Amino acid sequence: LFFSAPSGISAVNRLFMNKPKLVVILGPTASGKTSLVVELALNFHGEIISADSVQVYRGLDVGTAKPSAGERRRVPHHLIDILDPDQEYSAALFRRHADEVIHRLHLKEIPIFVAGGTGLYLKGLNRGLFRGPAGDAQLRASMYQRAESVGEGDLYQELQRLDPEAACRIHPHDVFRIIRALEVCTLAGKPISHFQREHGFRESPYEILKIGLYREREELYRRIESRVEKMLEMGWVEEVQSLLGRGYSPQLKSMHSLGYKHIVSHLSGEIGLTRAIDLIKRDTRRYAKRQITWFKTDPEIHWFPADQNGEAEIEAIVMDFFNHC
């Protein structure tokens, strides 16, 4: 990626009298977000906030495709490596942490870029999140135990009965979101979909430019498969083995992240390595498809091809966004 040095960036100073401006670079996994946002942030002398639900964890490096050490030296990154793998994280915590970083950078008049593929995090940053009941550790533990003993399908069937609207939006194997939805039903006496509808929309505290990267499906799938192979060469299996050896439970939410749970299954002898690799590739393709479906519902996204043909236009739009008051 190559960008010419921006001219007229001094006009950016005027925007800091108004709402903070965020340039959000989004797209499905393996679309090329990281390299683009690093070059943009470097060119505009900005900093990057990661909106990734797993890159927050220390030690989960290879399988989360964190920016390289070189990229992080070139451009400051925020909300990466802020938690241990056994700590809980959520969209609400991300919103709070991101707000703090944005406020700090805005006061310093530093252009702010956001990179991520976790749609809920980006939505919460833009429009806020509904306020449901606080979690109940004992209730969650009992539901996790139930999922282990009879399977998550039993929990999903209960959710379909109690909150069919939410069940339609949650994958049958997404045990964490299933349990959260059931937890809200139990504690509040109302389905989580009720709170989501009640929340509605409010004005964003930020001015946001959303830039989406797309690739043809066949090309995206090739990149996904190639990246999985590269991650394995970089020591993904050894990374998971190290985490388990340090005492982190395979039942942790972080260890159920995309790909990690299959490597755990391999290391425990449940499946062979070839089978684990096939499952990782399959689930990553499915995850990318869900991301695309989520992003397609947002009319505010400006889509560009994830190749050099769109770079100049992206740079011009970002420049105009920062300079427009």
Features from the language model and the residues they span:
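Phosphate/pyrophosphate-binding catalytic cores of soluble transferases and nucleic-acid-acting enzymes
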Residues: 3, 13-325
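Intrinsically disordered, low-complexity proline-rich regions
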Residues: 4-8
